[in-house]
């Protein structure tokens, strides 16, 4: 693809789409490149996104966001970006299908939630396998929940779920517990059962969990799983161009979402922000405003802003007598 864009956004989730919308409305030449694999796509129903009181499927939310951005002349391309490099004063982006160049780049590639080691569990993602208590606990009130994990975070999840249901089990899935003494005491105090044996199989109907089968041969009826196995931020592109990461592998940004590389920005779940769709969208807007301001200031420095049609007579070369005249 020829020509240097003002902005290229890598990632088509909520952060990328929100940034695209703002940049399009700022009349910036913007290209959004996405791989079609946003985690939001797999959410069967998003209930905590403002403006959708009846909920909305994650895929529908992405489709609406794309349609809205395209209205403001944002171009969208489906490609898998393989590398980002600095080339002079611009960035060179190599995709699997095409190459691209831009003055500014926003990385909004998100992360991948790691599913638990349970056969067949991936078919339950977004329907009865969940990764975020703040996102999904409300819909599971009174249901039978199993939290799969072995650390303090897993215990915190189990304790937090007691606000929504008393039917909570903590499953180690064949691993050794690593939580501290305080957390062990809370498990005992609140009488949360802990199962250590591995989960060998699950039964579901179109992604809706029905039963779990444990290594000892017992089966337990369950309605949903939460896992605290962890996440993998998609930050490799930022590393390749020299951006700094934190200890969790997330891209370090400042309050304007600037990375340690001038001209390179990051937003959404690939940064240390709380990974929520509405927060990602807000970060996308912040990054877009920062990028727009950055480009504006560069235009001022280089004297490349569009010229006014109503320039003063002195600007046209007429004598300047110090008076302002109106016609």
Please state what every model-predicted region is:
Residues 1-8, 76-143, 251-255, 259:
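FAD-binding core/adjacent interface of flavoenzyme oxidoreductases
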Residues 5-63, 68, 152-177:
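Beta1-alpha1 glycine-rich phosphate/pyrophosphate-binding loop at the start
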Residues 10, 103, 107-108, 147-148, ...:
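Redox-cofactor binding/interface segments in oxidoreductases and associated redox assembly factors
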Residues 41, 115-116, 155-156, 222, ...:
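Glycine/Thr-rich phosphate-binding loops of Rossmann-like dinucleotide-binding domains
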Residues 66-87, 93-94, 100-102, 163-250, ...:
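A Rossmann-like FAD-binding core segment of flavoenzymes
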Residues 117, 123-139, 229-278, 286, ...:
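FAD-site-proximal beta/loop scaffold in flavoenzymes
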Residues 125, 130-164, 169:
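Conserved FAD-binding catalytic core of PHBH/FMO-like flavoproteins
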Residues 157, 267-311:
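A conserved FAD-binding loop/helix module that cradles the flavin
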């Amino acid at each position: 693809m020829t020509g240097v864009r003002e902005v290229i956004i890598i990632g088509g989730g909520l952060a990328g789409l929100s940034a695209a919308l703002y940049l399009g409305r700022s009349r910036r030449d913007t290209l959004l490149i996405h791989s079609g694999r946003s985690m939001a796509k797999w959410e069967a129903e998003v209930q905590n996104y403002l403006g959708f009181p009846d909920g909305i499927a994650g895929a529908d939310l992405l489709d609406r966001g794309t349609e809205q951005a395209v209205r403001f002349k944002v171009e969208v391309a489906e490609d898998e970006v393989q590398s980002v490099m600095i080339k002079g004063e611009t960035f060179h982006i190599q995709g699997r299908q095409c190459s691209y160049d831009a003055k500014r780049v926003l990385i909004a590639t998100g992360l991948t939630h790691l599913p638990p080691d349970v056969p067949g569990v991936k078919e339950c993602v977004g329907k009865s396998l969940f990764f975020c208590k703040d996102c999904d606990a409300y819909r599971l009130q009174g249901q039978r929940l199993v939290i799969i994990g072995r650390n303090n975070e897993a215990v915190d999840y189990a304790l937090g779920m007691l606000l929504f249901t008393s039917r909570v089990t903590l499953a180690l899935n064949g691993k050794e517990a690593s939580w501290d003494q305080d957390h062990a005491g809370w498990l005992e105090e609140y009488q949360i059962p802990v199962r250590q044996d591995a989960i060998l199989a699950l039964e579901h109907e179109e992604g809706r969990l029905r039963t779990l089968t444990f290594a000892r041969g017992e089966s337990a009826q369950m309605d949903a799983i939460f896992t605290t196995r962890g996440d993998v931020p998609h930050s490799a592109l930022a590393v390749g161009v020299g951006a700094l990461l934190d200890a969790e592998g997330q891209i370090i940004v400042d309050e304007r979402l600037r990375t340690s590389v001038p001209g390179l920005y990051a937003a959404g779940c690939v940064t240390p922000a709380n990974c929520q769709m509405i927060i990602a969208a807000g970060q996308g807007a912040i990054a877009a405003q920062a990028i727009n301001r950055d480009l504006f200031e560069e235009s001022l420095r280089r004297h490349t802003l569009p010229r006014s049609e109503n320039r003063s007579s002195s600007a046209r070369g007429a004598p300047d007598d110090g008076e302002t005249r109106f016609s």
